[in-house]
Amino acid sequence: MEKKLKSWQGWLLFCGAMAVVFVLGLVVSSLMERRAETVSVFNNKRVEITGIEARNEVFGENYPRQYETWKETAKTDFKSEFNGNEAVDVLEQRPEMVVLWAGYAFSKDYSTPRGHMHAIEDITHSLRTGAPMDDKSGPQPSTCWTCKSPDVPRMMEAIGVDSFYNNKWGAFGSEIVNPIGCADCHEPTNMKLHISRPALREAFARQGKDIDKATPQEMRSLVCAQCHVEYYFKGDGKYLTFPWDKGFSVEDMEAYYDEADFADYTHALSKARILKAQHPDYEISQMGIHAQRGVSCADCHMPYKSEGGMKFSDHHIQSPLAMIDRTCQVCHRESEETLRNNVYDRQRKANEIRGRLEQELAKAHIEAKFAWDKGATDVQMAEALKLIRQAQWRWDFGVASHGGAFHAPQEIQRILGHGLDKALQARLAISKVLAQHGYTADVPMPDISTKEKAQEYIGLDMEKERKAKDKFLKTIVPEWLEKARANGRLAKL
């Protein structure tokens, strides 16, 4: 005989089913509302944008939520144990770096990076870009603008890529005026992610890859890889090029540069032909566990947020440590304190090796100069200079990637460890050269305990540099901005 449900059990089952249907209805309704709001955003644009629109404020008319969070990249109120979003004078913290960059503009000025909204201001105020008083003077090429503004692809389209690169930095001061923003990463009509800089596309092509076949998730990293990479200025035309032809590793790129017989500069003390790493964030991140598991840059640096029923990417691009609840804890269940300390532990270990490497490498440069002064020959110094080049390339590659100690901690420690080994080998090679010239005592070391003392030691006239920059900022930059406003390059909303 079949067992019948009691009356109250039937009613309980009925009510439970109704509750499930009700909840599902709410979920579907919420999803439909979100979709409707998303469609509404695209169908009710206040401004029709076509072509390359460099003025971020114009995009803000159509996408106010994204725009308002992007403006927060102007903030300088976050600080972690090793990084943050305010400009900190790294040369003041680590005066050995002045010696490592002797003969190169970075020995004058190097600070931690601020947010994207400061891109134009920071490069304009940097002592590295000099004080050009006209379109034809100054120490830097216009290639230095490449990653600073959506005005760059606009200018490339207008005058050609080669012509853009093959100019002085000061030549486009009145054109490159809007900081890193919307058009750098998005198509204007549908906001689809796109590649706006030629170097990344060209690097893929040389590897036999079609970047247009990248998945949407891959694009959430590749738009960052347009700039957060290692690159160099190739040839007299200063053509921006990624040295990826042999691979992503520090050894692969070194082999590429060696084959091309390339050096960024000749060191003022040691005479070593130095490679200056830029910021190989993308390459190093690809060697880490997160990228290998399919996590993109935007997943951690631009997490989703909800507002008014609308889900969108937070365009306040910053360290995930500033918002652990929306980044790390989306996947990891540990406490904020535990996760933060996990990051710091990796960074502390890498920085321990970094500090030792900087000290040994600075001594190697100083000792090499001492050997030259004692009459060393090119043949005698060849091995030491090769080792110095290799050591400094590994140091800079590891240090220039600001998040490398977290993105790929094992790889960063390997790179810095190899750099330290080569720096010590260089010092040993120099000691043998000195012995050949009858010198066996310790090489006297200058006082480079502060940035100012180190800059004086390598022969910089910093007062002259600052005075020239001050004049440039007070006379030339206002002219650039006035011309930009007159030509409609800055928004008037």
Swiss-Prot record:
It comes from the Bacteria. The keyword Calcium applies. Its cofactor is Ca(2+); heme c. Ca(2+) binds at E230, Y231, K276, Q278. Heme c 2 binds at C182, C185, H186, H315. Heme c 3 binds at H116, C224, C227, H228. Keywords: Calcium, Electron transport, Heme, Iron, Metal-binding, Oxidoreductase, Periplasm, Signal, Transport. SUPFAM superfamilies: Multiheme cytochromes. Binds 1 Ca(2+) ion per monomer. Binds 5 heme c groups covalently per monomer. Its EC number is 1.7.2.2. Substrate binds at Y231, H279. GO terms for cellular component: outer membrane-bounded periplasmic space. Heme c 4 binds at C297, C300, H301, H407. The keyword Kinase does not apply. Residues 1-25 form the signal peptide. InterPro entries: Cyt_c552, Cyt_c_NO2Rdtase_formate-dep, Multihaem_cyt_sf. It is found in: Periplasm. GO terms for biological process: anaerobic electron transport chain; nitrate assimilation. Its main location: periplasm. Pathway: Nitrogen metabolism; nitrate reduction (assimilation). GO terms for molecular function: calcium ion binding; heme binding; iron ion binding; nitrite reductase (cytochrome, ammonia-forming) activity. It catalyses: 6 Fe(III)-[cytochrome c] + NH4(+) + 2 H2O = 6 Fe(II)-[cytochrome c] + nitrite + 8 H(+). It is an enzyme of class 1 (oxidoreductase). Catalyzes the reduction of nitrite to ammonia, consuming six electrons in the process. Belongs to the cytochrome c-552 family. This is Cytochrome c-552. It comes from Bacteroides fragilis (strain ATCC 25285 / DSM 2151 / CCUG 4856 / JCM 11019 / LMG 10263 / NCTC 9343 / Onslow / VPI 2553 / EN-2). The lineage of its organism: Bacteria, Pseudomonadati, Bacteroidota, Bacteroidia, Bacteroidales. The gene is nrfA.
